[in-house]
Amino acid sequence: MLFRSDWQDLAAEYTKETGVPVTVVTAASGQYETTLMSEMEKSEAPTLFQVNGPVGLANWKDYCYDLSGSQLYGELTSDSFALKDGDAVAAIAYVIETYGIIYNKELLTAAGYTQDDIKGFDDLKKVADDIQARKAELGVDGAFTSAGMDGSSDWRFKTHLANLPIYYEYKADGIGSTDAIKGTYLDNYKQIWDLYITDSTCDPKLLASKTGNDAVAEFTGKKAVFYQNGTWAYGDVSSLGDDNLGMLPIYIGVEGEENQGLCTGSENFWCVNNAASEADIQATLDFLYWCVTSDKGTSAMADDMGFVIPFKAAKDSTNPLIGIANQYVADGKTSVDWCFSTMPSEEWKNGVGSALTAYAAGTGDWDGVVTAFVDGWAKEYKLANG
C-alpha cells in the first residue's frame, strides 16, 4: 500500500491516545487479494480489510459486517459512497480520487492556447496536433508524455482510459454494470489512444518498455504539455509549481462532452470482518470513527496522505489538483463515474493492455483491442461468476 508508513503512524497515534493496539498489515503492489486470502485463514484474522468496488465485494461479501447502524456510516456525506449487499451496508469508501489530463499551463500558453480553447475531443486534437507539429520551436518532445505500457504505467490506459467508453455505454444503456460489454464507444477509445501515441514524446513502438517514471520525467522536465494522471500524482509533478498545473477532462468525442468533468470515484472501501468477536468489531469501528472525525485522524488523511475523504469532518486538502477537481463540480460539470470497479477481472485488463501495446507497436490491429475488450469481458465475467 502506497501510504503504509502513514497508516502505521496513525495507528501508533491512536494507540498512544487510547491504549488500544492497532496492527497494520500491508501487501506488495498488486498482491492485496492474495495477501488478504492468506491473512483471513489465520486464527487471528484481520478485523478490517478493504475491497476495490463491486467486483471485489462479490468475493468478500460473506465476511462483511453490516455497517448500516454504525457511527462511521452516519459520518458519510453521501450514501453513494457506500457499497450495499441488499439492504446491508457492506463497505464504505474512505478516499475519493480524481483523474484527467494534467497539463503545464506555461507550455500551453507558450503554444498560444488556454484551457478555454479545449472544450471537447476535436479541440484537444487540434491543439495537440499543432504542438506536435511545432515541437522543435516550442522546445518540447511531444504534446503528450509517453503512454508507457510497462507494469508501472499501463493501468493508466487499460483501466483508467478504458473507463471512459464503459462509462458512456453504461450511461446510454441506463445500467451500472454488465455481464457483456457491447463496445459502443470503442471507436472513441481508439481516437483518444491514437492521439496519445501519435502526438507523443516517443515512437509508439517503444511504449512496451516505457515506465511511469519516464512520463513523470518528461512532464516535470517540460518536454510534454499533457500527462494523463490523477490527484494522487501531485507529489510527482509539484516541482512545476502549483500555479502552473491545470487539469482537463479526458475527452473522447462523445456528444455533449463540453459538459463533462473529470473522472471521480474510489477504489478503496473499508470492510469490517463479521467473523471477529463483538469486542473486536466495536474496537475496529471506534478506530475508524476516530480516523474520520478526530483532528489527528482527519489531518493525517488530508495532509500526510493527501486524501479527500467523503466524511462530514473532512479537512480541506492543500493539493491544488483537488482544488481544480472541486471547481469542475462547482461549475456544474458532470463528473465521470469510476466504472472500472465493474471490470470483470485483472486478466481482462491485462488482455486489453496487451492488445493496446501490440496496436501501438504495429504488430496488432485495432480489431485485437475490440476482441480483448468485448469477447474478453464476456469470458472473464463468466469465469468469475459461473
Language-model features: where?
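Glycine-centered hinge/linker elements that transmit conformational signals in sensory
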Residues: 128-129, 175-208
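Hinge/lid segment of periplasmic solute-binding proteins
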Residues: 52-103, 156, 160-162, 246-248
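Short, solvent-exposed loop/beta-turn-alpha elements that line the ligand-binding surface or hinge
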Residues: 66-80, 142-144, 148-151, 165-191, ...
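Conserved N-terminal structural module of periplasmic/extracytoplasmic solute-binding proteins
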Residues: 1-56, 208, 254-257, 279-283, ...
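A structural signal for short loop-to-beta-strand junctions that line the ligand-binding cleft
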Residues: 39, 46-47, 73-108, 142, ...
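Extracytoplasmic/periplasmic solute-binding protein
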Residues: 90-94, 99, 125-178, 224
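Conserved C-terminal helix/tail region of periplasmic/extracytoplasmic solute-binding proteins
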Residues: 109, 133, 298, 315-317, ...
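Extracytoplasmic/periplasmic substrate-recognition and gating elements
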Residues: 111, 239-304
